[in-house]
């Protein structure tokens, strides 16, 4: 995940690459493409699609949301992976054997996408489930932050054993709010001490193991006036300085409702690009991802 400084990640429309998309991804400011279910029919097709992409831009990286459970973009001809909640339940019932199994699931997920020439998955989810957020729910390992930390560490080890990078999400924790940031503006009224003693624990334990982190599109008004996506407090002071994270920071989809600021989508993009020279922030003009990386920073583990 090197050389992401000030560059962009885009999505594409279908199962083949259009001429317009070839022009977009050949731009030197584009570093990656994220694939969705709409881009996948079977393994042969997606390999061909990725070959088209990399023939157009050889150094481009390919990512996918292949978490397991209900968020698994590639399904046909792939092993159906268990949800993280199912793995967490196994961890609660049989901790010793679960660690090895969870590591194997992480390895399997990463190996399958690697064999299709995908470079990384936006996984694992590190949110602590408080039985509040339907958008998180069974995507979380557990309602116990320590169990989330242990299970996620094993999952990450499996990903790394397969030779791929990992992305922990959604910093500093999306599991305690009901609103879905895809269609709403989630807000959490808790204090910083409450967040540090609960939701932040998995991120604090795992920063040295994570190659990248994705912030949540949500606000903590009693902690900082800015949403996490745009917050110097959360991204610089807490994540970079306090937790010593040196890897890549991906934003979630900027077209989501939770990413809106006063103005419109273009204003959100301009907010990032105007800071890019100082902070290493790039924006996906197609509406998918923000990429932020500290100058000189490398992968976290």
Where are these regions (language model features)?
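Extreme N-terminal starter segment of soluble prokaryotic enzymes
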Residues: 3-7
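Second-shell residues forming the walls of enzyme active-site clefts
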Residues: 10-11, 17, 38-58, 62, ...
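Catalytic domains of carbohydrate-active enzymes, especially glycoside hydrolases
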Residues: 24-35, 117
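Active-site-proximal loop/short-helix segments
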Residues: 74-81, 119-139, 143, 165, ...
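A generic, well-ordered mixed alpha/beta core segment in the N-terminal half of proteins
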Residues: 82-112
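Conserved small/polar residues in nucleotide/adenosyl-binding loops
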Residues: 272-280, 297-301
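Generic short N-terminal amphipathic or hydrophobic helices
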Residues: 280, 289-290
